[in-house]
Amino acid sequence: MKKINEKTVYDGKWLGVRETLYQTREGKELSWECVFRKRSTVGVVIVARLMPSKRFILIKQYRPAIDGYIIALPAGLGFNDPDHALVELKEETGYAGKIVDVSPVLKSGASLIDDNARIVYIEVDEALPANQNPVQELEDAEDIQVLLVEPENAKKFLLDQISKGNHIAANLWYMFGINQLIA
């Protein structure tokens, strides 16, 4: 594949759409539309676990793009520094933790958007006073509920959420829905 030309066909406040003209291996021209982010560089997706109970911290968040709620991992945009995952976790869930592992920069949804993200694994000590009664620090535009899920019940929990009309993030289904089948 060889890029021939690229033009912006929509230029919004946060997102844009590009049309890119490619030449295929066979020499044919192919047009592709892609969404791009205008202000963010690398986001974080947070896998947070309460210790010692080993429950996962998930969120239920309203998303206008789907006009509904999605069960997902806490996440944030525009942070090159993985340490910002701690700030994002505190804002979205009220919990404070420590970073245990950070992935390299990964792509998410490369067929449609140019998103980059790191997966940040955080452990949250349930015994700390700050984690006894966590208080979220949400922005006005955020509608987020915190969900604590035991790993052994996670798949059933996700299926129950679907039956209630909520959506499930694909990365959660990978973690809890099929991971046991491929482990």
Positions of PLM-derived features:
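Nudix hydrolase/Nudix homology domain
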Residues: 1, 65-70, 74, 112-113, ...
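Short beta-strand micro-motifs in enzyme catalytic cores
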Residues: 16-20, 42-44, 69, 116-120, ...
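Active-site-adjacent beta-strand/loop module that shapes the phosphate/pyrophosphate-binding cleft
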Residues: 21-26, 52, 109-131
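Conserved hydrophobic "DFG−1" position in protein kinase catalytic cores
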Residues: 22, 48, 58, 121-122, ...
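The catalytic Nudix box helix
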Residues: 72-105, 120-122, 138-141, 150
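Acidic, metal-coordinating catalytic segment for phosphate/diphosphate chemistry
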Residues: 5-46, 51-52
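Short, solvent-exposed loop/turn elements at beta->coil junctions and helix N-caps
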Residues: 7-8, 104-109
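Conserved Nudix-box catalytic region and its N-terminal flanking loop in Nudix hydrolases
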Residues: 35-47, 52-87, 111, 129-140, ...
